[in-house]
């Protein structure tokens, strides 16, 4: 009986310590990690679609870059979130799923235009999110992650601005 009580107490202490660990992550940092994970899932999913549906070679190549780069970003944010005890979503947000569906309905050069427009606006928001974390985040590790991936978002924004010009999506 005492052994069972001791085991139950230990399990409860472990559960509470992991809960306290997750709750000790400031709201801004937690939101940034969750938003970054959703964004990475979105980019990977949309990039895979662009790899197959892209009309131009440039749109398909941009899709490949998104899958490659945002897969690395996803692994980094997952590792950081795990170390901080933050539970991340396993896919894009509901709004992002809607954007994927709407963009995917286009075909040919219309797909390329819709994809370029979507990604230009998305990467502008990614840069703003990274800037916000760098400015407002409390924990050093999420701030460093934001700083690291801000450069990638800027490169991606340049890719999609060029694609938008090529496919007359401006």
Segments predicted by a language model, with ranges:
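His/Met- and acidic-residue-enriched segments that coordinate or traffic transition-metal cofactors
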Residues: 2-8, 17-170
């Amino acid at each position: 009986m005492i052994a069972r009580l001791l085991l139950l107490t230990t399990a409860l202490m472990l559960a509470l310590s992991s809960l306290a660990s997750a709750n000790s992550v400031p709201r801004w940092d937690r939101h940034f990690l969750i938003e970054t994970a959703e964004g990475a899932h979105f980019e990977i999913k949309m990039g895979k679609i662009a790899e197959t549906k892209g009309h131009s070679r440039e749109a398909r190549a941009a899709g490949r870059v998104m899958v490659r780069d945002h897969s690395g970003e996803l692994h980094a944010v997952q590792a950081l979130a795990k170390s901080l005890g933050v539970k991340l979503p396993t896919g894009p947000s509901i709004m992002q799923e809607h954007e994927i569906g709407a963009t995917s309905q286009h075909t040919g050069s219309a797909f390329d235009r819709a994809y370029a427009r979507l990604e230009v606006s998305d990467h502008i928001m990614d840069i703003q999110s990274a800037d916000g974390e760098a400015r407002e985040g409390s924990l050093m590790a999420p701030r460093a992650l934001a700083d690291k991936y801000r450069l990638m978002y800027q490169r991606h924004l340049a890719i999609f601005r060029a694609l938008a010009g090529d496919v007359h999506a401006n």
